[in-house]
């Protein structure tokens, strides 16, 4: 608000599960209803790596009519066997009333497939595999990279995958 940018969003996790996940979800929904409209309009939910899966977070987002940011790494660490690509269209549809495209977070595990810590860099092969599967939805979306080496990791990823795609600029490609 102080920046006079009305499209800004706040990414949140659902939070704790004291009393069980169903109680935590109910508590989140009840608390959300007390937020001022200007805050409600800025909130987007992200699935987490320990407690609330992508499918649980999606259900909350649909109930509250708010966008969901899908975190791929969190899904890999915390899921109930759901195929993320079967959910992706539904997740992206939570953004239908927004002026901005859907967002996803992508990171690679530091050590081992289920390590919750973020690696310094992005695994280019895994990134390409995800993008090639996601393109079947035929919808623009933004990818936010979460890696310890920040911009250096972005430039390394671009170098790793540059031959796979048509590049619009140094950080934007089309599939």
Where are each of the predicted segments found?
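Active-site flanking residues adjacent to catalytic metal/cofactor-binding acidic residues
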Residues: 45, 70, 145
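Active-site-proximal loop/turn and secondary-structure-junction residues that shape catalytic pockets
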Residues: 14-18, 47-51, 72-76, 108-112, ...
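Histidine-acidic metal/acid-base catalytic patches
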Residues: 66, 77-175
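A generic short-segment signal for beta-strand/edge and adjacent turn/coil regions
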Residues: 12-14, 25, 36-39, 73-75, ...
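Active-site acidic/histidine proton-transfer and metal-coordination neighborhood
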Residues: 1-63, 67
């Amino acid at each position: 608000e102080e920046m006079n940018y009305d499209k800004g969003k706040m990414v949140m996790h659902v939070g704790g599960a004291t009393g069980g996940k169903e109680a935590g979800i109910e508590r989140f929904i009840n608390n959300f209803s007390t937020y001022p409209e200007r805050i409600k309009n800025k909130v987007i939910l992200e699935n987490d790596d320990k407690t609330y899966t992508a499918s649980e977070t999606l259900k909350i987002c649909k109930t509250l009519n708010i966008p969901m940011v899908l975190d791929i790494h969190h899904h890999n660490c915390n899921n109930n066997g759901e195929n993320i690509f079967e959910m992706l269209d539904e997740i992206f549809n939570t953004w239908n009333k927004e002026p901005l495209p859907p967002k996803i977070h992508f990171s690679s595990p530091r050590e081992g497939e289920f390590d919750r810590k973020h690696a310094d860099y992005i695994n280019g092969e895994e990134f390409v595999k995800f993008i090639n599967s996601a393109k079947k939805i035929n919808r623009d979306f933004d990818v936010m990279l979460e890696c310890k080496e920040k911009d250096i990791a972005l430039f390394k990823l671009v170098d790793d995958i540059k031959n796979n795609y048509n590049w619009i600029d140094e950080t934007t490609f089309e599939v």
